[in-house]
């Protein structure tokens, strides 16, 4: 099937990790045997009135990719002004794609703005439109009068909606209850098995090693709660009279604050900053557990990546995380210090089958599995 894969989130040379999970879906579709062209329309804030750049290439997986970069100090206005973006989209499609590629389907990623624009383009081409949904901010978008109607219409007119978790599916259905159940197919994110793989854990060391991976930044509405596991680990260390080491991976403006808290609690914490996936995998192999305290998750890629290495996870019982973590591969915690202490102690006292943990997650989220699940959705539209 010829698939025009449209997105407003996609990695670039300047932002190599922006929307990388969207790119992994594109690769999964390509590996499933579909003829896919990626069209990424990105709007960024820069100190210029208006600038547009078009880059065309085949990426490392052989996927034909057209990236349109719009730069302007009016970014926020242009990002929400859908008719303007649609004019650009149609122009780029006609000039750079239409001559030698006729799509059978448009596959958009995230309902706003890509899903709404994809809906309009699919209507003009008279072909089906499907949406993969990653977005946790749909409720806020539906409160915006200028775009809420377009979002509801895009969902309603789509041939299929593929949220990355049951949690996100339920959230969409609660916000727009008129959407029929048959429209939904849950398709998770890809976890790259060539990077994240099982390796036998080293046992009998004199310390228990924990790892945490996120961007540690201040936000108006906090989504990560590192102080929970820092304090809980410090308390468990004293209660059990054991050595604990915490490795914190990721950048952000909270690093100094968290370092001070760790020292204050007498917790041996090492802050590594931003690391590539290969280094993260190596650290996960050397750690006994991943800790992940958050207020919500639409999927939890970092958690799935840890499980893919066979590393048990201690995490918050929020969002989609209960779909990934259970008593066979970790512990789910209520977000308070006492329950986190109980969860950490319970995990330390549990003997996990690390190989089985890795195999089960690989079976659910490999490129092959996700590619086949998306193909099943496409096949229903023929």
Write out the residue ranges for each language-model feature:
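Short hydrophobic beta-strand element within catalytic cores of glycosyltransferases
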Residues: 312-315
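Donor nucleotide-sugar binding/catalytic pocket of nucleotide-sugar-dependent glycosyltransferases
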Residues: 40, 156-198, 212-215
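N-terminal subdomain of nucleotide-sugar transferases
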Residues: 1-59
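Conserved acidic donor-binding segment of nucleotide-sugar-dependent glycosyltransferases
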Residues: 327-338, 345-351
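Nucleotide-activated donor-binding/catalytic signature segment of Leloir-type glycosyltransferases, i.e.
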Residues: 259-278
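Short alpha-helical donor nucleotide-sugar binding micro-motif in glycosyltransferases
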Residues: 274-275, 282-287
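Conserved donor-binding/catalytic core segment of Leloir-type glycosyltransferases
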Residues: 4, 202-224, 230-234, 247
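Aromatic "clamp/platform" in nucleotide-sugar-dependent glycosyltransferases that forms part
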Residues: 295
